[in-house]
């Protein structure tokens, strides 16, 4: 891993929400400079997910009907999910997450739909924003360490993104701030 010290997330962009009561759907779009097949592998292979995603999977997400245990980084909670749609390399769907991959000249438009409790929508947007940055660097061959969970919340730039996304979405950010990282 390299370059983490030089990484800083850009401004909040490419996101919107669909509001439905307490459950809101985050829609985040990112254009990546990599072909859909390469992006698909990063979305479905547990070894790749471990490098960039905010969760670990104990198996491949590439097959409809596959039952996979997901563990969100920094939590002890394990949830079992079933892949409900897998059309490589176009659409992947499981639990409350849907990915669409659209080929572009020289890359892929990746769209994420993630249903999130409205109180945490800005957190989700900030977390996925950073995860997409880490994914892009991984696919480019210049990986940096995964920035997720409580470590992600302590990462410089995360709180700024939460504030920017909350303002964009017309949502109040949660009034909880992560504790500073422990010094060794």
Per-segment meaning from a language model:
Residues 47, 76, 98-102, 116-118:
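Short, surface-exposed beta-strand-loop junctions and turns on beta-sheet-rich folds
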Residues 90-96:
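Short, solvent-exposed secondary-structure boundary/capping segments
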Residues 17, 83, 99-101:
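A structural signal for short hydrophobic beta-strand segments in well-ordered beta-sheet cores
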Residues 1-21, 105-184:
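Terminal "cap-and-tail" regions of soluble proteins that handle hydrophobic small molecules
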Residues 77-81, 97, 108:
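Short beta-strand segments
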Residues 19-28, 34, 38, 45-89, ...:
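Short beta-edge strand/loop motif at the mouth of beta-sheet-based domains
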Residues 31-35, 71, 102, 113-117:
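Solvent-exposed residues in well-ordered beta-strands and their adjoining turns
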């Amino acid at each position: 891993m390299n370059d983490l010290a030089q990484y800083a997330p850009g401004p909040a962009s490419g996101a919107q929400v669909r509001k439905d009561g307490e459950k809101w759907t985050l829609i985040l779009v990112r254009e990546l400079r990599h072909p859909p097949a390469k992006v698909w592998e990063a979305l479905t292979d547990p070894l790749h997910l471990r490098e960039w995603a905010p969760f670990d999977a104990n198996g491949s997400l590439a097959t409809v009907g596959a039952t996979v245990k997901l563990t969100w980084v920094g939590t002890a909670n394990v949830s079992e999910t079933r892949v409900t749609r897998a059309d490589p390399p176009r659409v992947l769907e499981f639990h409350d997450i849907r990915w669409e991959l659209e080929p572009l000249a020289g890359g892929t438009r990746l769209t994420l739909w993630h249903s999130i409790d409205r109180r945490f929508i800005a957190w989700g947007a900030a977390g996925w924003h950073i995860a997409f940055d880490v994914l892009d660097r991984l696919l480019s061959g210049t990986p940096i360490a995964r920035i997720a969970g409580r470590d992600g919340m302590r990462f410089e730039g995360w709180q700024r993104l939460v504030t920017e996304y909350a303002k964009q979405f017309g949502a109040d950010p949660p009034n909880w701030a992560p504790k500073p990282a422990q010094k060794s």
